Amino acid sequence: MKMNVLQTLKERGFIEQTTHDQELEDLLSGEQVSCYIGFDPTASSLHVGSLVPIMSLAHMQRAGHRPIALVGGGTGLVGDPSGKTEMRKLLTLEDVNNNAEGIRAQLARFIDFDKGAVQENNANWLVGLKYIEFLRDFGRHFSVNRMIKAESYRMRLESEEGLSFIEFNYMLLQAYDFLHLFNEYGCQLQMGGSDQWGNIVAGIDLIRRAKGGSAYGITFPLITTSAGIKMGKTHKGAVWLDPERTSPYEYFQFWVNTHDDDVPRFLALFTFLPMEQINKVKDLDGAELNLAKTILAFEATTLAHGRDQAVGALEAAYNMFGAREIPADLLADSSIPREGAAKAEDSVPTTVMEQARLQEGVPAFELFDEIGLCASRGAARRLLGQGGGYVNNERIDSFDYKISLVDMKDNEIILRAGKKNYHRLVLSEK
């Protein structure tokens, strides 16, 4: 018997709370259901923290339902106070539209808009709203007493910053979005982060009061690592889905560096691999668990950037850190290349250097020439000037940059010239 998509989402760790749980399960067991999630266009790119809602829409589509990805081009002009301790900077319409374009392109990598999925921008119906008519027709359905009890408002009302009137309107606008999509697409389900519970319930109530219709909500848990760090954050900031902000290789390495305790959970959330295979990963450790991390990285990078980029990132990792043969029975449904993986270079060329020399620092152009990454110091200068020199996969942006002990990570420094020429520096034992 095919599993209901609600059961799938629960099993894989997507769900924190639902409204009318049994009714919702019955609804999703029947005919096609239209469901939506809103995406806030405060930046031109989504990041890894947005993957839970994106993947949930993809699961809905795979189960035969119709996902609606709503870019908040209209609500983005107001700003959502949910989960914020101070008022967001208001964006211009031009900023919001530009950001919305970038977000739509990224969503298309996960959701097939040629097979029934819908992309919408709420600016299409919110920007032209007439204020008096909106208050008369819909404002009467909202209780201020109930609104200020919502967690999203209560936290702001208790803060020193307070809650602006423009933000107070946000709940009404999001509720109206749900009503509009209910009218236009028969949309009965809204999903969102745990901080959206009050806004989702407001939309459900508006549909019931204004149309006498039934609607439902699902919220997702806040995903943190086992160390308690918010998902998608690193010491360098957010991990973006835009390859211009976070390269496919950096994206791949983000997943490779997953903490051991998080691997099964992240495989369930961020890949489509079967749970019966993922559950076996819980018993792995050491080298076998590291191979599971490689598969997680490959699958996640394939979804975000395509298979070619994932293969390129995998090969770069093999060339840099050494190849590992991946057993056929480890997460067997993964599309990761298994044959030939062990034929990659065992390691990159390595130079042993004395600590005292790196303590002082060596000019990058000098070192690139010395270890053979460039044919001469002049060639090395040209390479650096063109942005083709890297230390630990970070572009060297200055002619004067010196390679030093500060660059040492895990007892080594990885230098790169261009896309594929790597060299490792390690310290002598003296």
From Swiss-Prot:
Key words of the record: Aminoacyl-tRNA synthetase, ATP-binding, Cytoplasm, Ligase, Nucleotide-binding, Protein biosynthesis, RNA-binding
Motif ('KMSKS' region): 230-234
Annotated Gene3D superfamilies: HUPs, RNA-binding S4 domain, Tyrosyl-Transfer RNA Synthetase
Top EC class, one word: ligase
UniProt motif ('HIGH' region) ranges: 41-50
Record field: catalytic activity: tRNA(Tyr) + L-tyrosine + ATP = L-tyrosyl-tRNA(Tyr) + AMP + diphosphate + H(+)
UniProt subcellular location: Cytoplasm
EC numbers on record: 6.1.1.1
Residues bound to L-tyrosine: Y36, Y170, Q174
Gene Ontology CC annotations of this record: cytosol
Residues the entry annotates as binding ATP: K233
One MF term in the entry's GO annotations: tyrosine-tRNA ligase activity
Biological process according to GO: tyrosyl-tRNA aminoacylation
Domain S4 RNA-binding stretches: 362-427
InterPro entries: aa-tRNA-synth_Ic, Rossmann-like_a/b/a_fold, S4_RNA-bd_sf, SYY-like_C, Tyr-tRNA-ligase, Tyr-tRNA-ligase_bac-type, Tyr-tRNA-ligase_bac_1
Organism superkingdom: Bacteria
HAMAP family for the chain: Tyr_tRNA_synth_type1
Known partners and oligomeric status: Homodimer.
NCBIfam families: tyrS
Primary role: Catalyzes the attachment of tyrosine to tRNA(Tyr) in a two-step reaction: tyrosine is first activated by ATP to form Tyr-AMP and then transferred to the acceptor end of tRNA(Tyr).
Family of this protein: Belongs to the class-I aminoacyl-tRNA synthetase family. TyrS type 1 subfamily.
Protein name: Tyrosine--tRNA ligase
Lineage per the UniProt record: Bacteria, Pseudomonadati, Thermodesulfobacteriota, Desulfobacteria, Desulfobacterales
Gene: tyrS
